[in-house]
């Protein structure tokens, strides 16, 4: 299996640090507001990567943090007259509900920055002791000029970084690119006791401390959006490797493309958000997955109603195939399940090519539909179809059924009655049965092998 490593800028063979195990850390949200579909894009992609690694037999330990203290959280909380922790926890709850609605596998741990302050202080103290960091005015900064290979992830030199650097008023840095590990307290902000006085953690050190606590000094995969490569992930490498002395901090860096609305990135700062809640009120979770997975995780994706409507139609086709009832009277037809599985695996082994893997599922679905139309069935094909869809996180569950399994015998009886009426050329009565079942949310499909029924989606 080959994956693209941002650090090397090329495809590399995936070999975990420990045989059979994968330690995976994905940067989580800053819960200043409701999650948007840009978040959905990122976490759907990493959910599929995690699911596929599990399918390949790896035991995956997956950590995803919450940056629950931040300048923007503080500003929004102050504007609403509430505590920053209240705002953060409210939005974390909304986020977790959204992830469940999207069928995203929960992380093994969701550490919060505010709960990891002792570990953060330990790391900052260690970096000062080793000469990599210094205190100034109650804040602590990392000396980037002392960091060997600083810029290796973003492939930039310090001179290139300096072009856009500036020192904020009140900062007392030795060098403009030095970044804050600990921020001195300001009036009206949450703060914690530290050896340097009251303050709060810097953004970058939070993830280093949490990954160190839950995954150790080295991890296999670190994921996040491409907008995090610099400065966030670059700075994570610097402080983690300087603190532990172990290199590399991360073996494989994976970054997903960003979601655009027109020509602009979808983001809170631009105010052009579509929340996950809004999207799910119009489209199914399966449709959102198909929309995201129809492109490489590394590519940018443009949000459009047309693309999501097309994805919904595709999801509906897959749901109808998955909902097919087993009919023992139909002839078993062979499907080359080995070839379909090999195709799927070959594509996913090539840097998680979900677009081609998804196309394989649609191809298998079309073959199953053709077999059914010709009066046959393929039990193995149907099982593989559901298995591969599950690896991509597609639930393919008919939404809000208007019937239950208890009604199945009654529906079967009506289908037999309709068959007898048609044989007796009582077409009007036969059609009335079809119409009545349709109104109740039951779709009838006639084929050479007989009539089958399916539950319609909403």
UniProtKB/Swiss-Prot annotation:
The coding gene here is cysS
Q: GO cellular component annotations, sorted alphabetically?
A: cytosol
Q: What is its EC number?
A: 6.1.1.16
Q: How is the cofactor bound?
A: Binds 1 zinc ion per subunit.
The organism named in the record is Dehalococcoides mccartyi (strain ATCC BAA-2266 / KCTC 15142 / 195) (Dehalococcoides ethenogenes (strain 195))
A molecular function (GO) term: cysteine-tRNA ligase activity
Q: Which Pfam families match?
A: DALR_2, tRNA-synt_1e
Q: Which family does it belong to?
A: Belongs to the class-I aminoacyl-tRNA synthetase family.
Q: Locate the motif 'HIGH' region.
A: 29-39
> What is the official name of this protein in its record?
Cysteine--tRNA ligase
The UniProt annotation places ATP binding at: 268
Give residue numbers for sequence motif 'KMSKS' region: 265-269
Q: Where does Zn(2+) bind?
A: 27, 207, 232, 236
Disulfide bridge map: none
* Compartments, record wording: Cytoplasm
